C-alpha cells in the first residue's frame, strides 16, 4: 500500500501540461511501510546510541534522551494502570518537559492527545467533555483555573496539575489548587500512582497522536486529527529536502505545543532527528518576545523559526544587540512575508551576526506544518518557495475547481503524506476539506489564494475568505491593496478586514506606519489618495486605523478575528 504520489507524472485535475501542476522528481518513494511507526518508537530507536545527548532545555536544566524516555515509559505504565487504551483521548494544556513525556507515552500506548489552546474557550471545553469520554486532563494550574469556573472539569476522572517551573528529574511538590475537588491531583501524586499493569507498546503509525486546534484565521478552532505517521513522514521529508539539521543542533521552540508547527516542526520531529529543543517559558513579568532572542543567544540556538508577525514583535522588543552568531538556519512560517518585513528581519539578523538569511516556508495546520521550502534559485525571496519532496500543488478556481494556468491566481491545493486524517467528529467539514483527482489522489483545500509558475515556485497572496465582495460583484483581495500601500515609503504593514457600515458590506484597513510620529489623519488621506489613483482598486475602503502593532494569536500570527471585532480608533474616509 503506497501513500505516495511521487510517480514521474503530473498530478492534476486537467490533462494539459500547460496547467499549473508540479512534476515530482524524488528519487525515492515514500511508502506505507516507511511511515508505519509510532513517534515514540522513532525517538527511542533514533537516539538509542545517544542516550546522554540533550533532548530538551527548560528553565536552565538540560534533560537527556534517557531521562525523557524513562519518564515517558513511567507515564505510559501509569496511564495503562488507569485503564487508558489505544483510541482513548486525553487532554493536555501545558508546554513543558512533562507535556513532552505525556505525548510520547500516549504514542507508546496508542492513545491520542487533545491539545488545549487559548482558542478553546470554556464553552467549547464543556462541549468537548460532553461529546467525548475523556478520562484525564494534564494542565498547569492557570489552565485549570480557567476551565474550573464551570462544572465540566468535575466530570473528568482525574485532573493532573503539572508544575510549570520544574523540569524532569526534580522533586515535584503540589501546587496550589482547589483541594476540595477530589479528582484533582499533583504531578508528584500522579507519578506515585501504583502501577498495576505494565504498558504494552502499540506498533505502527496509523493511529491518532494529536488533536489540535487550527491557529489560522478561518474561524473557530477545529479538531485536527493527526496520526503518528504524519510526524514520521515530515521527518523523512526534511531529510530528503536536505535540511541541514544535525544531531546536537539546538532548535528554539518559539511556538508552543498548542500550535501544529510547534508540536511537529519544532518539537517531535527534531527529537526524532536527535536535536535539542529549547523550550522557552513565557514569564508573566518578562517580555516574552525579548526573552525568545535572549534565550536563543544564551543557549547558542542554531535554528530559529517563527511567523513574520512574531519576528517583527521579537525585533521590536529587542532594540539592543543580541549575539546570534550560532544561528545557521532561519525560517518564516505561518503567514506571507512582505518585502518590508523580509528586509527588516534580514537586517536584524545580519547586524547580529546570524549565519543565514530568512527563508520562507508555507504550510497549514491540516498538513502538520510545511509543504514548501526556500531554495537559492527562487525568483522572489518572499515567495512561499517550492514544494518539499513527496508534496505537490495545483491551483484551481475556488468555486468551480477548474485547474488554472501558470501565473493565474486561484485556490492552492496540496497533496502530501503529512495530511491530517480528519476533523474530529465533523465528517461534513472533513469531506469539504479533501478533493480527489481523476487518479484517485487526495488533495487538501487550503483556502489560500496563490499562483504557481512553470518552475514550481509558489506565491501566496492571502486567504480567500478575506476578500471583499464589492456591490458590483467583483472581488477585492488584500494583496491588491498591499501591492499599492507597501510601495509607499510611509507604510510598514497592512491588514484588511471586512465590516458592515450602515447596514451594507464594507472594508477597513489596519496600517502600521514606519514613522509612528506622523500625523494619522494626514497619513490616512495619503493612503486613500494612493488607492484612488492606482486604478486597480474599484471600491475604496471606508475606514483606516493607524496603529503600532497587530494582535497575535497563540501561533504568533496576526489575529484577524480580533482585528475584525475592533470598533474604535478608526478614521472615516467616505
Language-model features and meaning:
Residues 468, 495-500, 508-510, 528-574:
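Conserved C-terminal "lid"/linker of ANL adenylate-forming enzymes
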Residues 413-478, 487:
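Conserved ATP-binding/catalytic segment of the ANL
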Residues 232-250, 258-302, 317:
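Conserved AMP-binding/adenylation subdomain of ANL enzymes
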Residues 61, 77-120, 253-257:
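Conserved AMP-binding/adenylate-forming
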Residues 161, 178-213, 220, 243-250:
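Conserved pre-ATP/AMP-binding loop-to-beta segment of ANL
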Residues 69-77, 190-192, 205, 224-246, ...:
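Conserved structural elements of the adenylate-forming
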Residues 302-305, 315-380, 392:
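Gly/Ser/Thr-rich phosphate-binding loop
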Residues 64-66, 201, 209-233:
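Conserved AMP-binding A3 loop
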